[in-house]
């Protein structure tokens, strides 16, 4: 491909990009298309906030689940691994929550103004549309009194326009052009809306007429005017004298205007900081620009956290330097990078599959159950950590872990997904099913229990020497 061909392709791409930019805004040409545009842009901002808050909620669930998982891990290093992930999640969540809180206000303000604008245009569309005009009954006496020095007047006290309820649907071509995808900042940098007059002004086209010399005694109102004296009153002014008004239309034509959404070279939005009263289009342009400047960032999903991320993420390595080190030694994230990576590999590795299975799938692939007095509580790690019994679950498993010097408690049940298969079986069926057993008068899944710690076995996980029970009890009494 020669230089001329490259230039031609670049030129065509530029032209095509320019042709698609602002196409949604440029499609606004009438009230219905503007209402559709306003609502699409409002939806865009609201969906951005919803996506960010939903992801933040999900990440906070992961944080709570990893906090609980640390008490369920039998291996001491794996327990610290879950705790480190919980600390990392907390760091990420606090940071992203601050961004979501600060930016969401600007986005929702813009969305609210856009929805209010759509409602205003919709109301104007009803009033400005075609309808039936009624002049009401005029009064020549009141008319004479209402205008100084008038010889006669025909007063109309209740001219009205009645309009049917109208459905405002933009043509299909405009609806296809004004889409959520076209509300992205790189596709929209100008605003085109109906002018303010359409929503604030009712235009009336009328003509006044007279015949003969109208006077206060001309009080025939049958034809929407004031007629009398000689002849026969009619819609064609059959009487000798007449005075009246003819209203042709009541309504303001919709025309459009444009303004920019781009900030200035000093990164100030249009009319940012001004206290002057702004037209609707300028007020919306400022709000939209400020919403974009707020830079709402959707949090990265912790459910997609990868083993490879742990060895490169600065925040996590700083946490790992404290949490994963042995014997209380604090490592330097820069100087001890290799040692930290080895600890990460030992704790979470050796590969992506192992990490995901041990720390992500483990939150949902097993059911755990425990009893508080006579009440049985069960669920996955995720369900327990984020449910109504989260506090009880944490207290129970944390206390069991502490009571066994860091090992998972001997009576901590690990219940498989066969829990549901066993429920409701009769006593005979339960005893013949390999995965089930009778417990507490009910058929339940067989429970895998951790080994009871031996009195001579070291439970700290750090050394290989035996600890005698008497020595351990003495240490407890001393402290």
UniProtKB/Swiss-Prot annotation:
Localization annotation: Cell membrane
InterPro entries given in the database record: VSG_C_dom_sf
GO terms for cellular component: plasma membrane; side of membrane
Glycosylation sites: 120, 458
Keywords: Cell membrane, Glycoprotein, GPI-anchor, Lipoprotein, Membrane, Signal, Trypanosomiasis
Main subcellular localisation: membrane
Superkingdom field: Eukaryota
Topology versus the membrane: Lipid-anchor; GPI-anchor
Lipid moiety-binding region (GPI-anchor amidated asparagine): 462
Propeptide segments, given as residue ranges: 463-479
Name the record gives this protein: Variant surface glycoprotein ILTAT 1.22
């Amino acid at each position: 491909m020669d230089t001329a061909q490259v230039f031609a392709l670049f030129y065509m791409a530029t032209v095509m990009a320019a042709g698609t930019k602002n196409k949604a805004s440029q499609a606004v040409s009438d009230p219905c298309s503007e209402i559709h545009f306003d609502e699409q842009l409002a939806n865009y901002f609201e969906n951005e906030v919803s996506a960010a808050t939903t992801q933040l909620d999900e990440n906070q669930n992961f944080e709570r689940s990893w906090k609980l998982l640390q008490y369920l891990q039998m291996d001491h290093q794996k327990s610290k691994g879950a705790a480190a992930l919980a600390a990392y999640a907390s760091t990420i969540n606090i940071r992203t929550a601050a961004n979501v809180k600060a930016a969401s206000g600007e986005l929702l303000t813009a969305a609210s103004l856009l929805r209010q604008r759509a409602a205003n245009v919709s109301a104007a569309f009803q009033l400005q549309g075609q309808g039936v005009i009624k002049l009401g009954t005029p009064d020549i006496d009141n008319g004479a009194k209402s205008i100084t020095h008038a010889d006669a007047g025909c007063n109309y006290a209740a001219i009205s326009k009645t309009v049917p309820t109208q459905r405002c649907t933009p043509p299909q071509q405009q609806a296809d052009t004004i889409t959520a995808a076209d509300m992205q900042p790189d596709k929209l940098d100008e605003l085109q809306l109906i002018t303010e007059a359409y929503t604030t002004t009712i235009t009336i086209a009328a003509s006044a007429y007279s015949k003969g010399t109208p006077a206060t005694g001309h009080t025939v109102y049958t034809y929407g005017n004031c007629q009398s004296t000689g002849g026969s009153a009619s819609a064609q002014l059959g009487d000798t004298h007449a005075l009246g008004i003819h209203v042709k239309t009541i309504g303001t034509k919709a025309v459009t205007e444009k303004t920019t959404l781009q900030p200035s070279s000093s990164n100030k939005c249009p009319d940012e900081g001004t206290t002057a009263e702004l037209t609707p289009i300028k007020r919306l342009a400022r709000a939209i620009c400020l919403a974009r400047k707020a830079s709402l960032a959707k949090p990265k999903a912790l459910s997609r956290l990868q083993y490879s991320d742990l060895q490169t993420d600065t925040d996590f390595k700083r946490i790992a330097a404290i949490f994963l080190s042995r014997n209380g030694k604090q490592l330097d994230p820069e100087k001890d990078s290799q040692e930290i990576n080895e600890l990460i590999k030992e704790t979470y590795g050796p590969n992506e599959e192992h990490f995901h299975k041990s720390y992500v799938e483990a939150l949902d692939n097993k059911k755990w159950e425990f009893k508080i007095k006579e009440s049985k509580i069960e669920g996955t790690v995720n369900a327990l950590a984020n449910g109504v019994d989260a506090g009880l679950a944490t207290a129970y498993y944390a206390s069991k872990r502490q009571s066994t010097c860091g090992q998972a408690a001997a009576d901590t049940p690990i219940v498989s997904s066969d829990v549901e298969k066993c429920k409701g079986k009769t006593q005979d069926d339960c005893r013949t099913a390999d995965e089930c057993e009778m417990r507490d008068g009910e058929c339940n899944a067989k429970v895998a229990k951790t080994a009871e710690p031996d009195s001579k076995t070291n439970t700290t996980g750090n050394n290989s020497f035996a600890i005698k029970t008497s020595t351990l009890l003495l240490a407890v009494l001393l402290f």
